[in-house]
């Protein structure tokens, strides 16, 4: 993979990234930061010239009064959700950068938020240990309390299946839980980590779940059975994992490295370091919808951009 350049605009750690799913979107990526802002980025026409930033801010979304921890983009519209340590979730219109709605019920920092595959439901979680399901009008419809997590919920995502809406959550209680959205029932609890879980993600076809955290183990699970399929020891606390949308690859961001694994061979196929330098710690990643670009967010406030060469 090739290093293409960076996006510069945040004044704090880049905590979360998301790429639009619509083909041909003029927005390339949306980022959140500990500076309390959200930025939507467009391509820079001069990005290939020397010393030019790869992208330019399209809108800077301001309004949160704490660190912004997570962003999720609607699949079919120009809306974004953000979660913040100010205990709120906000919905934004990316076309004009305006906040459309606030979601208020969490009693502590909100760490994770996600749109459902059909954009009709929203799920959120954080340091009050409670997973909440909302409609897009801002009404809290369910709280997953029975068989819930016993510590902070750090990561949450939907499975892409519309027929059987499933939510997967990862927690500081060292477990992953799989939830039936309609009934609010915990279908299974996945145990395999020896320390807190910081990231969970579901594969594009909905069959696999990957999890990672403080123990430095990336675990791959069969989502339908709960069986642990295999484990990759990366020997450094894991910040985020992201499946490629169209290759059998998985990107793992840790305190020490940013690596892409081939899931069939379980081998590293790319160690991502710009120009041979040791970059700042990567804490967030996102693949473009076509799988040809990877964005990484770092503690030096920059977003780095990587492209897949034709040979790959």
From Swiss-Prot:
SUPFAM superfamilies membership: WD40 repeat-like
Keywords assigned: Repeat, Ribonucleoprotein, Ribosomal protein, WD repeat
WD repeat positions: 9-42, 63-93, 105-135, 148-180, 192-222, 233-262, 279-307
Lineage: superkingdom: Eukaryota
InterPro entries linked: G-protein_beta_WD-40_rep, RACK1-like, WD40/YVTN_repeat-like_dom_sf, WD40_repeat_CS, WD40_repeat_dom_sf, WD40_rpt
Pfam families, per database record: WD40
One GO location term (cellular component): ribosome
PROSITE patterns on file: WD_REPEATS_1, WD_REPEATS_2, WD_REPEATS_REGION
Single GO MF descriptor: ribosome binding
CDD domains tied to this protein: WD40 (cd00200)
PANTHER family listed in its UniProt record: RECEPTOR FOR ACTIVATED PROTEIN KINASE C RACK1 (PTHR19868)
Family as reported in the entry's similarity comment: Belongs to the WD repeat G protein beta family. Ribosomal protein RACK1 subfamily.
Name of the featured protein: Small ribosomal subunit protein RACK1
Species: Leishmania major
């Amino acid at each position: 993979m090739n290093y293409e350049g960076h996006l510069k605009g945040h004044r704090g750690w880049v905590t979360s990234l998301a790429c639009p799913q619509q083909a041909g979107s003029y927005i390339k990526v949306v980022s959140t930061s500990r500076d309390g802002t959200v930025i939507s980025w467009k391509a820079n026409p001069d990005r290939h010239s020397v010393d030019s930033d790869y992208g330019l801010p399209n809108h800077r979304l301001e309004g949160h009064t704490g660190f912004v921890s997570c962003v999720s983009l609607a699949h079919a519209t120009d809306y974004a959700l953000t979660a913040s340590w100010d205990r709120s979730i906000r919905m934004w219109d990316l076309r004009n950068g305006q906040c459309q709605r606030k979601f208020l019920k969490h009693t502590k920092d909100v760490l994770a938020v996600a749109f459902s595959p059909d954009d009709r439901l929203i799920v959120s979680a954080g340091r009050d240990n409670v997973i909440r399901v909302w409609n897009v009008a801002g009404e809290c419809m369910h709280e997953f309390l029975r068989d819930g997590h016993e510590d902070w919920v750090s990561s949450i995502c939907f499975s892409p299946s519309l027929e059987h809406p499933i939510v997967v959550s990862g927690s500081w209680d060292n477990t992953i839980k799989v939830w039936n959205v309609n009934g609010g029932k915990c279908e299974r609890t996945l145990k395999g980590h020896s320390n807190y879980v910081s990231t969970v993600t579901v594969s594009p076809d909905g069959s696999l779940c990957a999890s990672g955290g403080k123990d430095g183990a990336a675990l791959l699970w069969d989502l339908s059975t709960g069986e642990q399929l295999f484990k990759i020891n990366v020997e450094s606390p894991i910040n985020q994992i992201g499946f490629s949308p169209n290759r059998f690859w998985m990107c793992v961001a840790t305190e020490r490295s940013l690596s892409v694994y081939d899931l069939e061979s379980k081998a590293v196929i790319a160690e991502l370091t710009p120009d041979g330098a040791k970059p700042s710690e990567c804490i967030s990643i996102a693949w473009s919808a076509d799988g040809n670009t990877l964005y990484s967010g770092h503690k030096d406030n920059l977003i780095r951009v990587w492209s897949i060469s034709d040979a790959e």
